[in-house]
Amino acid sequence: MPKLHLISLGCNKNLVDSEIMLGRLQNYDITDDISDADVIIVNTCGFIKSAKEESIQTILEMHEARKNGSLLVVTGCLMQRYKDELIKELPEVDLFTGVADYDKIDEIILKKQNLFSPETYLQANEERVITGSNYHAYIKISEGCNQKCSFCAIPTFKGKLKSRSLENITNEVKNLVKKGYYDFSFLSQDSSSYMRDQGINDGLINLIDEIEKINGVRSARILYLYPSTTSKELISRIIASPIFHNYFDMPIQHISENMLKIMKRGSGAKKIKELLNLMRNAQNSFLRTGVIVGHPGESEEDFEELCEFLEEFKFDRISAFAYSKEEDTASFEMEQIPAKIISKRLSKIEKITKKAINESLQKELGKQIYASLEGISSEGEMFYAAKKDIWDKDIDGEILINESDVKELEIGSLYLCEVSDVVDQKLVATIIKKAK
């Protein structure tokens, strides 16, 4: 069989697209050896400057390492956003495609022709090859975005919001449950807008209702809630759910009224704080957010207000980003803040972030928690790795398992564990017994 090497860069929404391509290319053997691959696919990210640079660097590295006669295929957001420039500037690449044709990747390779269909690909009933887990899967619920954030170019190359049908989503989950998957993360650019393109404002509540009816779904969470489209009713429905964890991932980007207006976030600080307090007051809640520092217009007062809020509110996880000046955005034409100031602000925010994460982890000491066994840890074979049941896979942390009262451990199974230590932002725990 011919051999395939695929690299998926950027977010987990990109990973889903990569898994769809793998589903179309099941006549290939997957190889980790680039020099042995007959086809190499790079699924790129084009969101911010650092992601674009990583994508270009990866493409060039793949070209350097590949064997004669192999095909180098580049797809994804970077290609969609800069297709004309990159086709001219990357002679190393054999085939180009964007964000519209993941389900046609086999035809593109067979015909050896570039393809850029006009509409962003919206997943229907295509079979995916899930990677990196035998129990957890990401489920994409929509494509595109109708928001108008001043810093974000995603709507310019991903298009307007397009929601998958409830039937498509539930069928995918049912099929994955049959294969042994029991833990799901539902995601999109703006998950709380799900079905609003079809005139339904509580689409996410409807989705929760339907997922709860599926036997075999043990746990779930929703990623990328957007403040202006997140309702108190939605939060209450998540809290009431026996399946969906009280996991709230809502990037606020800022908390200063001035900055929320400049960033065109669509909701003020008062509403954001009301939503966050509802989330925090839920039993065993877990709150994740994201912020941007150095956006044009951010004064020292705005920045200090953000710092104070992050220190006071005690998020469990915070992702902090330096503002990236992007073409085709409202903030591109604004007066920019000097890079030195942005770097200094980011450094301060990162210290707050680290402290918040450590405090969240320290709360787990001595507790008994449920966690899924992942395999060998990032620290090597001395430890197994596990994921706490409420956490999202990969982004919320790793539990190091150093001892077990259970002799025969099964990768992907859920275990009751006791947390004994926190080391380098990782929990250390002992497995007590297998969950029922």
Swiss-Prot record:
The keyword Metal-binding applies. Its EC number is 2.8.4.4. [4Fe-4S] cluster 2 binds at C145, C149, C152. One of its GO terms (cellular component) is cytosol. It catalyses: L-aspartate(89)-[ribosomal protein uS12]-hydrogen + (sulfur carrier)-SH + AH2 + 2 S-adenosyl-L-methionine = 3-methylsulfanyl-L-aspartate(89)-[ribosomal protein uS12]-hydrogen + (sulfur carrier)-H + 5'-deoxyadenosine + L-methionine + A + S-adenosyl-L-homocysteine + 2 H(+). [4Fe-4S] cluster 1 binds at C11, C45, C77. This is Ribosomal protein uS12 methylthiotransferase RimO. It comes from Campylobacter concisus (strain 13826). The lineage of its organism: Bacteria, Pseudomonadati, Campylobacterota, Epsilonproteobacteria, Campylobacterales. The gene is rimO.
